[in-house]
Curated annotation (Swiss-Prot):
HAMAP family: Ribosomal_uL15. It comes from Phytoplasma mali (strain AT). This is Large ribosomal subunit protein uL15. Residues 20-30 have a biased composition (Gly residues). Keywords: Ribonucleoprotein, Ribosomal protein, RNA-binding, rRNA-binding. It comes from the Bacteria. The keyword Ribosomal protein applies. GO terms for molecular function: rRNA binding; structural constituent of ribosome. NCBIfam families: rplO_bact (TIGR01071).
Amino acid sequence: MLHQIKPFKGARKTVKRLGRGCGSGTGKTSGKGHKGQLARSGGGVRPGFEGGQIPFFQRIPKRGFHNINQKKYSIVNLGALEILENNTLVNQELLLEKKIIKSILPNGVKILSKGKLTKKLNFKVSKYSKKAQENIKLVGGNIEVN
């Protein structure tokens, strides 16, 4: 029974066998044309190569720069902290434990004010925005830098 199962007609394409005589349609040069770099074994050009003319990516001007002094923070918005209980001490370890952040970046955690905070929370984080500080103080919370 199982040995008789076959795929539907047209479901499996027959592989094109190369270099098997002129009658096959892909004999002799096997679809690679006559001589040249592309006909050789392992031959070909690198991505972006345009035959010797200045490539497109070199013709367009450079833009921007990479700031080596950039500080990277794990961002937490106030709206994401609604799941916490009142009077909780919010620090990096708690945020990781509750899966509010995936990882702690080199400079720690920064609190931003997106979303609404209704619970009184105490924060001990690396950095915070002015607006976040205002919203935390408004609901009776406390924030300090560790």
